[in-house]
Amino acid sequence: MSRTPLSALIAATLLCATAQASAQQAQPDFPDGPGKQTFVNLCGGCHDINRVRLGYTPEGWRTVMRMMLNFGVPVPQGEIEPLTQYLIANFPERPRPAAVIIAGPVEAAIKLWQVPTPGSRPHDPLATRDGAIWYTGQLSGKLGRLDPKSGVIKEYPLKTPQTGPHGIVEDKDGNIWFTGNHMSLVGKLDPKTGDVTEYKMPDPKAKDPHTIAIDGNGMVWFTAQNANMVGRIDPKSGEVKLVTSPTANSRPYGLVINSKGIPVFVEFGVNKIATIDPNTLAIKEYALPNPASRPRRLALTPDDAVWYADFSRGYLGRLDLASGEHKEWPSPSGPQSQPYGIVFTKGALWYNESGAKPNTIVRFDPKTEKFQSWAIPGGGDIVRNMSVTRDGNPVTANSLVNQLGLVEVK
């Protein structure tokens, strides 16, 4: 089943408590049974039957409930379990494509850690220079730091409640920067003191800072997906500049910085990849050949070629920005495999298939053009971004199962 509506599901719950009039009208659309009235009163005015019918596993629905509670949805204590059981009974997970596991020459093992706050929804991971693994707890309103050697996780509360931390990056001084996806801000955490500095968006339309990266000059870049913007922060002056994408509803998403210091980003709402000039802030767009392409994340190889995970079509792709040359390969688990997070390390592209069951980690060797893949233990669900440790191992955050992962390449 597709996981793409989950963000909308969570965001809409903020309105559910005030939607009872609409919910009463929607009541006939939902199956009868214990828990129905709670669902109708709190959620039915915001979520139509088709969205909810996308379904989850029993544990998935329990996780969604914890996420909603973390985010302040006013479910009475005595109604939490009946509502959960109602969702489990009536909206099971829809069939998903079976993962295709391909053997190959590389040995790798996947290690997992459970994050301490239930329903945290760890969104983006970050491997830092000191060997730690950080993550954004999007629905706990916290950042977390894992020591992979000891397994100890420390959580850092943020200044603004329900910030919705999303993207995460480390600066040269060891500060941890993050995007406040729900509160129109970018933040900086000092891990030594726990102090948080916030940079508020100067335009109220820039409500959802998304992915974040830092260039070689220390400038902080970020996308704002639904605002259709790209932003830049000068940490020295605190100035925030915003630029609107030239294509309406293009939804700037994944973001990386190439070797020339140029930010490269995906436009998830259309079939485009774009760059932004760090001096003039002019945006240049590159259309992908297939109009149905919708990459979410991208990675760069040492030659600055752009590799992307085409979520909508189940492909891995390569785009040379200089020549315009383009090539694609179908992902092992097929057109509904939903490739998502992607990194380049140890001479290969590593990405995950978020639509396959179980979720997979896929390795692609650009020299031989051969794939190799591994099932994520426990099923995964769902890796939205990846990072790379100082010794070159891929790192994941598995949001729906509340886990962090490390792919130890032998």
Briefly describe each language-model feature range.
Residues 133-139, 176-182, 220-226, 263-269, ...:
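Conserved beta-strand positions in repeat-built beta-propeller and related beta-rich domains
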Residues 111-142:
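Beta-strand-rich domains and repeat architectures in extracellular enzymes and scaffolds
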Residues 71-100, 394:
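C-terminal capping alpha-helices of c-type cytochrome domains
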Residues 40-50, 83, 87:
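The canonical Cys-X-X-Cys-His
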Residues 380-410:
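Blade-level signature of beta-propeller repeat domains, shared across WD40, Kelch, NHL, RCC1
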Residues 147-151, 190-194, 234-238, 277-281, ...:
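Short loop/turn segments that connect beta-strands within beta-propeller blades
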Residues 21-38, 70-73:
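Electrostatic cytochrome c docking/interface patches
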Residues 118-130, 161-173, 204-217, 247-263, ...:
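Beta-rich, blade/repeat-based domains predominating
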